[in-house]
Amino acid sequence: MAKKLKKNEEITKKFGDERRKALDDALKNIEKDFGKGAVMRLGERAEQKVQVMSSGSLALDIALGAGGYPKGRIIEIYGPESSGKTTVALHAVAQAQKEGGIAAFIDAEHALDPAYAAALGVNIDELLLAQPDSGEQGLEIAGKLIDSGAVDLVVVDSVAALVPRAEIDGDIGDSHVGLQARMMSQAMRKLSASINKTKTIAIFINQLREKVGVMFGNPETTPGGRALKFYASVRLDVRGTTQIKGTGDQKDSSIGKETKIKVVKNKVAPPFKVAEVEIMYGEGISRTGELVKIASDLDIIQKAGAWFSYNGEKIGQGSENAKRYLADHPQLFDEIDRKVRVKFGLLEESEEESAMAVASEETDDLALDLDNGIEIED
């Protein structure tokens, strides 16, 4: 009996070795035909973290879980009209440029305001802009930019405005059932692999429509078919809530609106988190406002009555004065921002220390130059 078991084990081992050898040969052939990394064991990539780029909003970075938009993925931003969708996307453009990247904006709606984009921090001289004549042209331009591997972020505004060529050439009133959905489905199939390979972030802004005859459930839907919903790694629902009134002479005027950004789909972190931000008219998301609120909740900024203080030093009476103080002191803003990110696990402690050390060295070098009588150019 023991001999029989031993023989069976030897046969199993022999077949196992043969199968392993056959697998190794197959992997070598695949690598030869399709390049290194075409097939790999999942464990080889298990240690790799998802690469992200900040959204330009601290609250949204926290809600996204990973610390920003994942690179090499498709993002969909949708919501009602004038809810702040383009503003959220433009903050991503500004952030990409801030990190030294190249951004492109496919303006299918032909409605981009350069002055507003510049106010949000976008370098309009460096921004690549396309205003396509048809949906196919817009998606083809996006595809060529992504394939180049030189662009870090592509924004398409909006999916609803990507009109198929056949619809443009036809008459108003002609029926074109499913034409846009088929166009988007084909585009997603072509673009998804290239987006992942080049680590480009592709943001698609979308509008809302209502399904006719829906009695129960949510009647809202987004145009362009189901393909974008499936291919998107992150979907953001942007909704304006209440108006923000001004102070003093502007107390009767609306100077902005409180906005909720809900992460309705997230493939890289837990979904359904909500970011609450203030979008100020002509300025975009109030970064100082969200920092004061979040840091106060974490007790990084201490609040006593109407006064806000940091490390025992008062920074303002009332949130508006605290926001103004942080805006005037960018180094302090960055320091508090880093501490908040460490608290939420978006930044390693070592990264924070190293970033602070670099800032400290720069300050020390500047002080040394001044002591030595060296002139500092503006």
UniProtKB/Swiss-Prot annotation:
Transmembrane segments: none annotated. InterPro entries: AAA+_ATPase, DNA_recomb/repair_RecA, DNA_recomb/repair_RecA_CS, P-loop_NTPase, RecA-like_C, RecA-like_N, RecA_ATP-bd, RecA_C_sf. It comes from the Bacteria. Its main location: cytoplasm. CDD domains: RecA (cd00983). Disulfide bonds: none annotated. ATP binds at G79, P80, E81, S82, S83, G84, K85, T86. One of its GO terms (biological process) is DNA recombination. Gene3D superfamilies: P-loop containing nucleotide triphosphate hydrolases. GO terms for cellular component: cytosol. It is found in: Cytoplasm. It holds the Pfam family RecA_C. One of its GO terms (molecular function) is ATP hydrolysis activity. Keywords: ATP-binding, Cytoplasm, DNA damage, DNA recombination, DNA repair, DNA-binding, Nucleotide-binding, SOS response. Belongs to the RecA family. Can catalyze the hydrolysis of ATP in the presence of single-stranded DNA, the ATP-dependent uptake of single-stranded DNA by duplex DNA, and the ATP-dependent hybridization of homologous single-stranded DNAs. It interacts with LexA causing its activation and leading to its autocatalytic cleavage. This is Protein RecA. It comes from Streptococcus pyogenes serotype M49 (strain NZ131). The lineage of its organism: Bacteria, Bacillati, Bacillota, Bacilli, Lactobacillales.
